[in-house]
Regions:
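N-terminal accessory targeting/assembly segments
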Residues: 1-87
Length: 87
C-alpha cells in the first residue's frame, strides 16, 4: 500500500464485526476488543462494533441475510465507509 492510500484511509469511519460460533466457549468479547484495537492501530475510526453469533462456518452463508440487512442499515445510519470483519 502506498502512502497516498494510507492517507486516504486515515480516520475512515469503520464498523467492526466479530462473528463467533454460538456453541464455542471462547472469549468473544476479548476477540472483539482486539479487533477494535487493531482497527485503531491502523488509524481507522471504529464508530460501531458488534458480535454476531453463527451456527457454523459456511462460506456460502457466513452471515445470515437478516444480519446483512441490519449491517447495511448501520452503514447508512452511521455513514460508515468500511466494514472490518474479524474472522
Amino acid at each position: 500500500m502506498n502512502s497516498l492510500n494510507v492517507k486516504l484511509m486515515n480516520n475512515t469511519p469503520t464498523i467492526v464485526v466479530h462473528p463467533y460460533i454460538k456453541r464455542s466457549r471462547g472469549s468473544k468479547e476479548i476477540l472483539l476488543e482486539e479487533a477494535i484495537k487493531l482497527v485503531q492501530a491502523i488509524n481507522l475510526n471504529c464508530i460501531y462494533s458488534s458480535l454476531v453469533g453463527i451456527d457454523s462456518i459456511n462460506p456460502k452463508t457466513y452471515l445470515k441475510s437478516g444480519y446483512v440487512i441490519f449491517l447495511k442499515q448501520k452503514v447508512i445510519d452511521l455513514s460508515a465507509e468500511l466494514i472490518f470483519l474479524n474472522t
